[in-house]
Amino acid sequence: MIFDVAGLLAAGASASAHPHVWVTMQGELVYAADGSVTGVRYAWTFDDMFSAFATQGLEPKKPGVFTRQDLEPLAKENVNSLKDFGYFTFAKANGSKLEMKEPTDYYLDYNTKDTVLTLHFTLPFKAPVKAKELNVEIYDPEYFVDFSFKDVKDPISLVGAPAACKLVVARPKELTVPPGQQLGEAFFNQLSSSDNWGAQFANKISVKCP
């Protein structure tokens, strides 16, 4: 599975503290012609160490160059694994929780210069919804995975949204540890997803429409 704790540690991830995987992301909120929002279109770029771990054992036709076809089985495994984590996406429309359908249009590509994988996928909402207020948060409740918006002007955009809709994107705060204290693996091993500890590092998207 894509977020296999034991496998990542065996591959050399630090056992001293979370997180173990870093994801830099961009995305689009997709709207239908009637002004309802239908889902989120993502591009998640994994750190180079995780990318190396994930591609171990793959045999591309050209060494070091992975095509979408080479990565197709891995892409499928990735999106299947993400289901167990709720796709790390928590959305509400007009104050009510939105359920997700399974991802569509998913694929992986590989940047040979930076040696990183990027997972592209569309995450549809179970039903389109006309939302005066839409809030989406992306984070890992257990903070095994660190998510952050790409360092660009507009990491999130609206596609097909009514012109009067206003988008606000908020980046997560940095983790600060008081002097003399450490948040090692023992601390995180006590956590479960229900503790929702990682919510304090949520990447937040807010859209308000008249």
Where are the predicted features?
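Short, solvent-exposed beta-strand/turn "edge" segments of beta-rich domains on protein surfaces
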Residues: 16-18, 30-39, 108-114, 195-198
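Short solvent-exposed loop/turn micro-motifs enriched in small/polar/acidic residues
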Residues: 22-23, 83-84, 200
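Mature, soluble, non-transmembrane domains
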Residues: 94-210
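N-terminal signal peptide c-region/cleavage motif recognized by signal peptidases
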Residues: 11-14
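Early extracytoplasmic/domain-onset interaction patches
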Residues: 19-52
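Sec-dependent signal peptide recognition
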Residues: 1-8
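Structured domain cores in non-transmembrane regions
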Residues: 49-129
